[in-house]
Amino acid sequence: MTEAPTELPPEDGTPPREPGDEWVIEILRDIKEEALKHFDPRLLTALGGHIYARHGDTLERARELIRVLQRALFTHFRAGCNHSRIGQTRGGNPLSAIPTPRRM
């Protein structure tokens, strides 16, 4: 068997990133974008500052922000956010427009 090629460090001399780093950063951008639609930006800035004070500018900080924002958004949607169907009784099933097979 041949060994997997080793990753070369970037040309600017910084240490190489792990493969999942880009994914974590991309997910954080998406969640922050969604959180800004539902929460006060000052609150999100304060949250980011608090997590930065605990974890510094690390990948662990990004993961912690993702965890906290996911929980906050889930709770917000369950409480009946007007931008979401989760927790709301009005509005029909979005899948009801799809016809079911006759023999079901």
From Swiss-Prot:
<dbReference type="GO" id="GO:0046718">
    <property type="term" value="P:symbiont entry into host cell"/>
</dbReference>
<keyword id="KW-1163">Viral penetration into host nucleus</keyword>
<feature type="region of interest" description="Disordered">
    <location>
        <begin position="83"/>
        <end position="104"/>
    </location>
</feature>
<keyword id="KW-0805">Transcription regulation</keyword>
<protein>
    <recommendedName>
        <fullName>Protein Vpr</fullName>
    </recommendedName>
</protein>
<keyword id="KW-1048">Host nucleus</keyword>
<keyword id="KW-1079">Host G2/M cell cycle arrest by virus</keyword>
<dbReference type="GO" id="GO:0039592">
    <property type="term" value="P:symbiont-mediated arrest of host cell cycle during G2/M transition"/>
</dbReference>
<dbReference type="GO" id="GO:0042025">
    <property type="term" value="C:host cell nucleus"/>
</dbReference>
<dbReference type="GO" id="GO:0075732">
    <property type="term" value="P:viral penetration into host nucleus"/>
</dbReference>
<keyword id="KW-0131">Cell cycle</keyword>
<comment type="subunit">
    <text>Interacts with human UNG.</text>
</comment>
<dbReference type="GO" id="GO:0043657">
    <property type="term" value="C:host cell"/>
</dbReference>
<dbReference type="GO" id="GO:0044423">
    <property type="term" value="C:virion component"/>
</dbReference>
<feature type="region of interest" description="Disordered">
    <location>
        <begin position="1"/>
        <end position="20"/>
    </location>
</feature>
<keyword id="KW-0804">Transcription</keyword>
<comment type="function">
    <text>Stimulates gene expression driven by the HIV-2 LTR. Prevents infected cells from undergoing mitosis and proliferating, by inducing arrest or delay in the G2 phase of the cell cycle. Cell cycle arrest creates a favorable environment for maximizing viral expression and production.</text>
</comment>
<keyword id="KW-0946">Virion</keyword>
<keyword id="KW-1121">Modulation of host cell cycle by virus</keyword>
<keyword id="KW-0010">Activator</keyword>
<keyword id="KW-1160">Virus entry into host cell</keyword>
<keyword id="KW-0597">Phosphoprotein</keyword>
<keyword id="KW-0014">AIDS</keyword>
<dbReference type="InterPro" id="IPR000012">
    <property type="entry name" value="RetroV_VpR/X"/>
</dbReference>
<dbReference type="Pfam" id="PF00522">
    <property type="entry name" value="VPR"/>
</dbReference>
<keyword id="KW-0945">Host-virus interaction</keyword>
<feature type="modified residue" description="Phosphoserine; by host">
    <location>
        <position position="84"/>
    </location>
</feature>
